[in-house]
Amino acid sequence: MLDSIKIKLQYLLPKQGLTQLAGWGANKQGGWLTQLVIKAFARYYKVDMKEAQDPEFSAYRTFNEFFVRPLRAGVRPVVAEENLLAQPADGAISQLGAIREGQILQAKGHNYSLEALLAGNYLLAAEFQNGQFVTTYLAPRDYHRVHMPCDGVLREMIYVPGDLFSVNPLTAANVPNLFARNERVICIFDTAFGPMAQILVGATIVGSIETVWAGTITPPREGVIRRWTYPQAGCEGAITLEKGQEMGRFKLGSTVINLFAEGKVYFAPQLNSGAVTRMGEVLAEAVPTTPSY
């Protein structure tokens, strides 16, 4: 009964207005009030401040500064082998597996369209047909910077406006086409094993989505799809990111979806729905190397 009420509220609440209000408040320097909110949040969600570069709450002037706090050097070692992909974020696996007949598993009993996720771009969707996907959910307590699973050259970025439903497990299990209807930023990289998509999905009270090369992508929320293209590898202005390098962040947190082309990666066998992820640990092995787990 309670879960049903929570889902109905997702449809009824003014999500855009709540998100704007949360973003405004999270950027305010509220002195003692900001400190009170940060400490209450950390206590409620059991945030491990020992991992933070600066573990003192007083170091953070705004809630957003606290929320996107960097980690201490060395607490997230990145898997070194060239053929191994690293997990892009701290969180938990929502779902992972094969993209079948253009459909991606959202939750038990719920699929959504690959093409819809990619804003109706059928040419882009064709690059990932019959490929692999992994969805990583970042809970409020998690580290909220997103990193590269592998070396890659940025090909294009697409901002897709949309709803701002919560992306927690309850909502994922009950709101159809959740990730294809929410606001998102699609980043396409060319890698040594083919194309890779890294998609940052917005949600209720996610005040902004940022990337390291373009800064804040949203807000503003103008309600139109925006697309940027970038030079190829070796050309002037090409944007190359290394495995483990930060590529974006959420204020506040949300979900990351990775897409891979057909036959290009083997996910680590210990990963399944609900598995805890830590940025830098093994996500998958890239072909043509034979899996060696």
From Swiss-Prot:
InterPro entries: PS_Dcarbxylase (IPR003817), PSD-B (IPR033177), PSD_type1_pro (IPR033178). GO terms for biological process: phosphatidylethanolamine biosynthetic process. Its cofactor is pyruvate. Is synthesized initially as an inactive proenzyme. Formation of the active enzyme involves a self-maturation process in which the active site pyruvoyl group is generated from an internal serine residue via an autocatalytic post-translational modification. Two non-identical subunits are generated from the proenzyme in this reaction, and the pyruvate is formed at the N-terminus of the alpha chain, which is derived from the carboxyl end of the proenzyme. It catalyses: a 1,2-diacyl-sn-glycero-3-phospho-L-serine + H(+) = a 1,2-diacyl-sn-glycero-3-phosphoethanolamine + CO2. It holds the Pfam family PS_Dcarbxylase. Its main location: membrane. The keyword Acetylation does not apply. The modification Pyruvic acid (Ser) is found at residue 254. Pathway: Phospholipid metabolism; phosphatidylethanolamine biosynthesis; phosphatidylethanolamine from CDP-diacylglycerol: step 2/2. It is an enzyme of class 4 (lyase). It comes from the Bacteria. It is found in: Cell membrane. Keywords: Cell membrane, Decarboxylase, Lipid biosynthesis, Lipid metabolism, Lyase, Membrane, Phospholipid biosynthesis, Phospholipid metabolism, Pyruvate, Zymogen. The active site is at 90 (charge relay system), 147 (charge relay system), 254 (charge relay system), 254 (schiff-base intermediate with substrate). GO terms for molecular function: phosphatidylserine decarboxylase activity. Belongs to the phosphatidylserine decarboxylase family. PSD-B subfamily. Prokaryotic type I sub-subfamily. PANTHER family: PHOSPHATIDYLSERINE DECARBOXYLASE (PTHR10067), PHOSPHATIDYLSERINE DECARBOXYLASE PROENZYME, MITOCHONDRIAL (PTHR10067:SF6). Catalyzes the formation of phosphatidylethanolamine (PtdEtn) from phosphatidylserine (PtdSer). Heterodimer of a large membrane-associated beta subunit and a small pyruvoyl-containing alpha subunit. HAMAP family: PS_decarb_PSD_B_type1 (MF_00662). This is Phosphatidylserine decarboxylase proenzyme. It comes from Yersinia pestis.
